[in-house]
């Protein structure tokens, strides 16, 4: 069977994390009542004029810097002209001729341990279109999304398989999330992925027609779409047929790509400069200031967690899978020096609760202060690790009491006073005289039994190390 070289390019549309839209003051909020967040500018009323959202430009600069791009200091916009119901003006404001970012790169770590640099062609700013909802042979339009700020990030056609495409989008998502450029929720459409896929026989310098797959909304769907489309195109080429230039979509139910439309000729969008937005000169000092305030990226945190805080790579990676968990961890380690204990508790019992309730850590009652208090009390030998089974369910669901108040109310403090422990042992020793006779031959069994009775009598509130020493001493004194 003939082997083919796979050529993949990735385009990502990323909704910017701004309070207002790209060219209007309308509020940006997901899940609101349809058509309640669109003003005269968004709906293209005659006489309305756009104004550039400064915050959106800042976020675009941050993204360009993180992706090692050349940042253009002259900000200009263009009109992309076409008619479609989701585009009220009859054109989209974008950056065709002069994107804010060019010639970037992003390194990904492959599963075989090798690394690959993905070349990025451009990053440009534009506005989103209205959302289309298809139902019962009708199409509804929600203009709440119309005009929301976007950045589009386009790679060069340098990816070669589904693994690379998935790893690239995952890494891009992580960077944009930790930069606070976007919430990158693929299921909500704030990170949308388009793929351009073509095949050619190895050794050929001619590309076959590319097929575009639109609006992939999960990493798993990216993988499935790439694998299906590669096989589909292979079958066509092996029959000596021509792959038609098409736009397709991925269908979850059939696990296949479905034809949306064929592309016989490329569409002429009649691009020209946006006359209502004058060119804006971005001062180099302003760009430098924006970059200097860039949040710490996940890769930087990963190095710090392992090298400075002593976490394992595995624990660091689990913490960093969620921005909410990472922020919680950062706040907690400011209140305690037992960084490993914080990580272990977050990724075990706390994560188990989050998984059970399908929540993020900022959606439950647990506070960094209370988690740090539990760890500090254990480290100071005021409570035992066993007592966390009593305390944690309370502080996970309520923040009305401090941990110290809970410990006091439930009498959970460890008994560490030797005289007090000795007094508690008197009755236990007296009730187990026959057992003590076995001590010379079976010392471990005797100690374990006496310790068990002591723990039962005190509800486990005795320091085990101190108690063990006193138990041995008391037994030997009563032989």
From Swiss-Prot:
PROSITE patterns linked to this entry: GATB
Enzymatic reactions: L-glutamyl-tRNA(Gln) + L-glutamine + ATP + H2O = L-glutaminyl-tRNA(Gln) + L-glutamate + ADP + phosphate + H(+); L-aspartyl-tRNA(Asn) + L-glutamine + ATP + H2O = L-asparaginyl-tRNA(Asn) + L-glutamate + ADP + phosphate + 2 H(+)
Superkingdom of this protein's organism: Bacteria
GO MF term list: asparaginyl-tRNA synthase (glutamine-hydrolyzing) activity; ATP binding; glutaminyl-tRNA synthase (glutamine-hydrolyzing) activity
UniProt entry tagged with the keyword Endoplasmic reticulum: no
This protein's UniProt keywords: ATP-binding, Ligase, Nucleotide-binding, Protein biosynthesis
Top-level EC class as recorded in UniProt: ligase
Pfam families, per the entry: GatB_N (PF02934), GatB_Yqey (PF02637)
Record-linked InterPro entries: Asn/Gln-tRNA_amidoTrfase_suB/E, Asn/Gln-tRNA_Trfase_suB/E_cat, Asn/Gln_amidotransferase, Asn/Gln_tRNA_amidoTrase-B-like, GatB, GatB_C_1, GatB_Yqey_C_2, Gln-tRNA_amidoTrfase_suB_CS
Enzyme Commission number, as recorded: 6.3.5.-
BP term (GO), one: translation
SMART domains: GatB_Yqey
Keyword Isomerase appears in the UniProt entry: no
Function statement: Allows the formation of correctly charged Asn-tRNA(Asn) or Gln-tRNA(Gln) through the transamidation of misacylated Asp-tRNA(Asn) or Glu-tRNA(Gln) in organisms which lack either or both of asparaginyl-tRNA or glutaminyl-tRNA synthetases. The reaction takes place in the presence of glutamine and ATP through an activated phospho-Asp-tRNA(Asn) or phospho-Glu-tRNA(Gln).
Family per record: Belongs to the GatB/GatE family. GatB subfamily.
Summary of subunit composition and partner proteins: Heterotrimer of A, B and C subunits.
Protein's name in the database: Aspartyl/glutamyl-tRNA(Asn/Gln) amidotransferase subunit B
Gene that this sequence comes from: gatB
């Amino acid at each position: 069977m003939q082997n083919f070289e796979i050529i993949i390019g990735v385009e990502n549309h990323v909704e910017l994390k701004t309070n207002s839209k790209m060219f209007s003051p309308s509020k940006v909020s997901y899940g609101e009542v349809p058509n309640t967040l669109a003003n005269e500018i968004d709906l293209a009323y005659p006489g309305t004029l756009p104004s550039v959202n400064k915050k959106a430009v800042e976020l675009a600069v941050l993204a360009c810097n993180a992706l090692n791009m050349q940042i253009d200091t002259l900000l200009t916009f263009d009109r992309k002209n076409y008619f479609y119901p989701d585009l009220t003006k009859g054109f989209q404001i974008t950056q065709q001729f002069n994107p804010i970012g060019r010639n970037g790169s992003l390194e990904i770590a492959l599963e075989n341990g090798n690394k690959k640099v993905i070349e990025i062609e451009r990053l440009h700013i534009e506005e989103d279109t209205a959302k289309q909802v298809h139902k019962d042979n009708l199409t509804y339009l929600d203009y709440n999304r119309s005009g929301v700020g976007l950045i589009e990030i386009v790679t060069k056609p340098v990816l070669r398989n589904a693994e690379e495409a998935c790893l690239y989008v995952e890494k891009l998502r992580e960077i944009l999330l930790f930069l606070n450029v976007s919430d990158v929720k693929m299921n909500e459409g704030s990170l949308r992925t388009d793929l351009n896929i073509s095949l050619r026989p190895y050794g050929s310098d001619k590309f076959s027609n590319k097929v575009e797959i639109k609006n992939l909304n999960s990493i798993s769907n990216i993988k499935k779409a790439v694998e299906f489309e590669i096989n589909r195109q292979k079958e066509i080429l092996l029959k000596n047929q021509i792959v038609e230039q098409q736009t397709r979509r991925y269908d979850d139910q059939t696990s296949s790509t479905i034809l949306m439309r064929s592309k016989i000729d490329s569409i002429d969008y009649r691009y020209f400069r946006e006359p209502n937005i004058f060119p804006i000169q971005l001062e180099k000092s302003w760009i430098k200031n924006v970059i200097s305030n860039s949040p710490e990226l996940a890769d930087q945190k990963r190095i710090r967690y392992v090298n400075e805080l002593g976490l394992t790579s595995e624990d660091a990676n689990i913490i960093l899978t969620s921005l909410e968990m990472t922020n919680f961890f950062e706040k907690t380690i400011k209140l305690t020096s037992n960084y490993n204990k914080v990580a272990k508790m977050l990724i075990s019992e706390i994560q188990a609760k989050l998984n059970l309730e399908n929540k993020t850590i900022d959606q439950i009652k647990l506070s960094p202060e209370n988690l740090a208090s539990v760890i500090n009390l254990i480290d100071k030998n005021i409570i035992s690790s066993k007592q966390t089974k009593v305390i944690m369910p309370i502080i996970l669901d309520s923040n009305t009491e401090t941990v110290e108040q809970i410990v006091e109310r439930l009498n959970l403090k460890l008994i560490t006073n030797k005289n007090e422990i000795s007094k508690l042992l008197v009755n236990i020793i007296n009730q187990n005289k026959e057992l003590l006779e076995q001590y010379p031959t079976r010392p471990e069994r005797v100690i374990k039994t006496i310790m068990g009775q002591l723990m039962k009598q005190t509800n486990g509130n005795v320091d085990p190390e101190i108690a063990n020493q006193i138990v041995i001493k008391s037994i030997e004194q009563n032989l």
